[in-house]
Every structure is written in C-alpha cells, then in structure tokens.
Amino acid sequence: MELGALLDHLVGKALATMLGGIPIVKPSPTELIPQQPDCVEVGTCRVIGGVRPQNFDVVYRPDGVRFAFDSKTLNDCKSVQKNYQNMINDLGTEATTVHTRFPYALVAFLVAVPHPCLSSPQKEALTGTLERLSSRASPLNSNHKAEAISLVVWDPESGEVDRDWPENTSCLRIERFSQQIQTAYLARYKGLPPHA
C-alpha cells in the first residue's frame, strides 16, 4: 500500500471511530453525495466548493461537507525542492474551496516528507508556513486556513517518524493531530444529528 493511501485509511478509520463506529465506504468519484446516509468516505471524493471542484482523500458529508482530509506526500528530494511551494498553495486553495461553501466544515491535511529531503532553510520555511495555515479556530476565521495540519518527517530506511521535528511546541506534531480534529468537531457539531 502506498504511503498516502495508508495515511488516508488510518485517518478514515479514526474518524469513523470518533463518530461512533459508523461505516467506511469507498466513494464514487463522480457522486456528490455519499452512497450511505451516515458514513466516512475513504478514496477519491469530489467536493464542489466555492472556488473549484476538488478531490479529497477522506470526507464526511452527512448533510454537506463536515470534514475533508487530504494527504500530501513528497517522496523524493527533487520533488520536495521543486514542489513544496506549490503544495502549500494547493493547501490554501483546498481549504478556501471547502470553507467558502461550508464554513463550519473541518479541513485537515497531513504532509509527509522524507527526512533526508528536508534541510535548512527549507525545513524552517515549510514548517513556519504550515503553522500559519493551521489552527483555524472558528468558522468566522480565514477561509484559507485548515483546522488541523500535521507535518510528518519520516526516515525512509527505517520507516520511523522523526521525533525531533517539528519541535515539541509545534501545532504540527502528529501526536496533536487527532485531538485538534476532535476538539474542533465537537465545538461545531456536538449534539447535532446524525450522531447526536
């Protein structure tokens, strides 16, 4: 299984558990509503937002988009150097696309970069920019921000996550990702159907 697909599966499973053990289904890439009334969709899922149609990897949309997730993997040094700024632009556009039409929706991103491909000053620049794009606290805040972003720096030899970067105080730490999503989701949707 490719890294991005593995991350999507894990996020979808955690989201379905958080929502009370609802089913996980594979979406139809052309359908604008889910195949079941209350499910988490994992796979290419089309969302029609305020800027353009956008594909996401994990979506929960019982009554419109409530949660949209996209994983971004830059798998080699050439790709990181060449594409990381474009990826940052994509994140802002994807968040804007969802939040313009669904301001209460949660948008989350997980960015995975191999450790050997992330060096100074690019490492600090990428981290700082992702921190600024993260932590959208209210539906009234900037549409271009995501409610949660995680930066995962990993060792391609061992498969282990770098425990030293991002720094321990960063909102981008993978250990904080699920809690940020749960906190934001409960603040916006607690007590509302379909899982009241």
Name what the model sees in each region.
Residues 1-43:
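Acidic-basic catalytic patches of nuclease active cores, encompassing PD-(D/E)XK
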Residues 73-123:
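Catalytic cores of nucleic-acid endonucleases
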Residues 51-69:
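Active-site beta-strand-loop-beta-strand hairpin of nuclease catalytic cores
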Residues 68, 108-111, 151:
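Structural beta-sheet core signal
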Residues 39-54:
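N-terminal low-complexity, intrinsically disordered segments
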Residues 16, 99-100, 141:
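N-terminal cationic-hydrophobic initiation segments that often serve targeting/anchoring roles
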Residues 119-196:
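Non-catalytic C-terminal interaction segments of nucleic acid-processing enzymes
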